[in-house]
């Protein structure tokens, strides 16, 4: 069989894990946005002012008063509450991980999950790049409430589809500077680019990360930006024909679970678009015959 349905225990544990992870992710987002930076009193001359620091810049919130004292206490008490919530939810995920492994619902390779978490932290994953290829099946099997047969999931790489139309202003500054390769090296320092410029990175274990993008259709227009970072050694996306409709397809967020039993957020194209793309690939004469058979499956 190409897939099997989740049993009752697996389904229940999957849902429970997703709910805890959603609460954890929401708390992390609240901490990063509402309580980012720091807040402190500063004395200037004979007066004391409340200052808020964000992205390395201090800004005055006004002279010390009952109102600014309330702002100060609210900030620090609120941040402490959120940090406590994150700690408790993280501990809960630690408790659930071995159960997830025992029930065999942890599916995604650990290295792939670590890469996705790093790119999510850098705000690259989702708005700028999305997963296509075999690893997307971990999201699709969750959407279907099934587990796909192992041979269909076997892969030693992960493919990222780059949408060059997206602005990099919301990307973490260090990611916009160093690019995809620098973020991969934060996961595993052995990642290096294959070729110069290259669209592929490989680590010491032979795990591959490919960056692809749609080929331009207008020879007159300026070619689209083909790399994320400004670093000269960053990966340069390879242009592939007929990927434009994948970039334009609706995206969906799905929680997968890695082989250690920990959840990871995935952003993938609509499964119907993925299926059509694979069906088209299976008919291409220039496609590797071994890959064509997997595409058709």
Regions found by a protein language model. Name each.
Residues 1-48, 53-297:
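Compositionally biased terminal segments of proteins
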């Amino acid at each position: 069989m190409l897939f099997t349905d989740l049993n009752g225990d697996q389904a229940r544990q999957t849902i429970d894990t997703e709910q805890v992870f959603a609460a954890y992710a929401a708390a992390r987002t609240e901490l990063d946005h509402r309580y980012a930076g720091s807040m402190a009193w500063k004395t200037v001359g004979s007066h004391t002012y409340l200052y808020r620091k964000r992205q390395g810049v201090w800004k005055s919130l006004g002279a010390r008063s009952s109102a600014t004292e309330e702002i100060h206490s609210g900030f620090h008490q609120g941040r402490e509450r959120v940090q406590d919530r994150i700690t408790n939810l993280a501990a809960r995920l630690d408790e659930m991980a071995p159960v997830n492994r025992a029930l065999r619902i942890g599916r995604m390779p650990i290295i792939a999950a670590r890469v996705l978490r790093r790119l999510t932290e850098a705000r690259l994953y989702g708005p700028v790049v999305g997963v296509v290829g075999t690893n997307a099946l971990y999201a699709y099997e969750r959407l279907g409430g099934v587990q796909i047969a192992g041979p269909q999931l076997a892969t030693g790489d992960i493919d990222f589809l780059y949408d060059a139309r997206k602005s990099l202003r919301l990307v973490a500054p260090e990611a916009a500077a160093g690019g995809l390769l620098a973020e991969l090296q934060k996961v595993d320092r052995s990642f290096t680019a294959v070729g110069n410029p290259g669209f592929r990175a490989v680590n010491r274990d032979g795990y591959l990360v490919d960056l692809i993008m749609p080929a331009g259709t207008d020879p007159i227009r300026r070619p689209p930006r083909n790399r994320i970072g400004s670093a000269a050694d960053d990966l340069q996306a390879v242009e592939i024909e007929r990927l434009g409709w994948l970039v334009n397809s609706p995206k969906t967020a799905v929680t997968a679970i890695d082989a250690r039993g920990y959840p990871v957020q995935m952003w993938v194209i609509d499964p119907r678009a993925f299926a059509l793309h694979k069906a088209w690939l299976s008919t291409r004469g220039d496609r590797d015959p071994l890959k064509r058979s997997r595409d058709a499956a």
